[in-house]
């Protein structure tokens, strides 16, 4: 785990290279790229550069994933507005609009708004959230685990999920490995719980859902919470069931005092926790809770 640190006795150059590629560079671009693609989905290719610049500015200002999400939507709609404002340009100059006018003005307007309007309050909110979670960590570990686990399932990859995940990474950097154990457990439960429900309550899911449930086993095991989104979108009752199961799993990891120094990996990094079996038990119990709740609240499906 610490072999990328030159001060650690286990240091080796290959691990340091991997850390430089991933942690020092690739991971720092995640928010910027996310914002760029959000903007592009709204305004097509001219929105990508303004969105990416806005997302990078959010990262630099410690506004986190929430700042990046706002930057993406902001840049996208800024470019949409520019497209409407510049309809008067002669058709002979249309080629300039997507490669020069929209990106250039989009970057300028998005950058100014991010710098003077968005970044400061969003960064303050993220800092408040981090400090609040840290205060819970010193006062009541189990309560912190319940909250962090539940946050991972509320929006399954959205701002709250990413806020919890970002907090966990920050705690790992600070040498506190307990919070991220709850976070990763909570993030695995929604797809795993749904997968179990489709297996043991087959009559309450369509054939297509049962087939998708098999995929959820793998996505849950790999800590891909987003695998549960199609089920939640089709039936909102999935969300409270997932939140309860994730909160149970997160609370149990803190009750068992599990620590996890790895930022990602799902069940495949369980062996590096201080209590691998108790960690896996926490995840299984949380998934079972979600599955049972779904089995109770969902009605049988009539196959045509």
Curated annotation (Swiss-Prot):
Keywords: Cell membrane, Membrane, Phosphotransferase system, Sugar transport, Transmembrane, Transmembrane helix, Transport. One of its GO terms (biological process) is phosphoenolpyruvate-dependent sugar phosphotransferase system. InterPro entries: Bacterial_PTS_Sugar_Transport, PTS_EIIC, PTS_EIIC_2, PTS_IIC_fruc. The phosphoenolpyruvate-dependent sugar phosphotransferase system (PTS), a major carbohydrate active -transport system, catalyzes the phosphorylation of incoming sugar substrates concomitant with their translocation across the cell membrane. This system is involved in fructose transport. NCBIfam families: PTS_IIC_fructo. The EIIC domain forms the PTS system translocation channel and contains the specific substrate-binding site. This is Fructose permease IIC component. It comes from Bacillus amyloliquefaciens (Bacillus velezensis).
């Amino acid at each position: 785990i610490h072999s990328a640190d030159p001060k650690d006795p286990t240091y080796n150059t290959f691990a340091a290279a991997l850390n430089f590629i991933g942690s020092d560079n690739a991971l720092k671009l995640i928010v910027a790229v996310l914002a760029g693609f959000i903007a592009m989905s709204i305004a097509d290719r001219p929105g990508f550069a303004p969105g990416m610049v806005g997302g990078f500015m959010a990262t630099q200002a410690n506004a986190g994933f929430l700042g990046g999400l706002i930057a993406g939507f902001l840049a996208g709609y800024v470019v949409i507005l520019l497209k409407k404002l510049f309809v008067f340009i002669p058709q002979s100059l249309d080629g300039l609009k997507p490669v020069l006018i929209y990106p250039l003005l989009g970057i300028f307007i998005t950058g100014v708004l991010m710098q003077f309007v968005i970044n400061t309050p969003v960064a303050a909110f993220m800092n408040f959230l981090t400090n609040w979670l840290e205060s819970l960590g010193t006062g009541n570990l189990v309560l912190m685990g319940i909250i962090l686990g539940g946050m991972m399932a509320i929006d399954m990859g959205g701002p709250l999920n990413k806020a919890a995940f970002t907090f966990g990474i920050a705690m790992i950097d600070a040498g506190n490995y307990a919070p991220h154990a709850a976070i990763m457990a909570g993030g695995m439960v929604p797809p795993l719980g749904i997968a179990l429900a489709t297996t043991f309550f087959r009559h309450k899911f369509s054939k297509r859902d049962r087939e998708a449930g098999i995929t959820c086993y793998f996505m849950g095991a790999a800590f891909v919470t987003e695998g549960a989104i199609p089920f939640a979108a089709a039936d909102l009752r999935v969300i409270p069931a997932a939140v309860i199961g994730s909160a149970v799993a997160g609370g149990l990891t803190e009750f068992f005092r599990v620590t996890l120094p790895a930022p990602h990996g799902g069940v495949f990094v369980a062996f590096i926790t201080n209590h691998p079996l108790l960690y896996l038990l926490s995840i299984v119990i949380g998934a079972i809770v979600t599955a049972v709740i779904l089995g109770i609240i969902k009605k049988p499906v009539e196959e045509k």
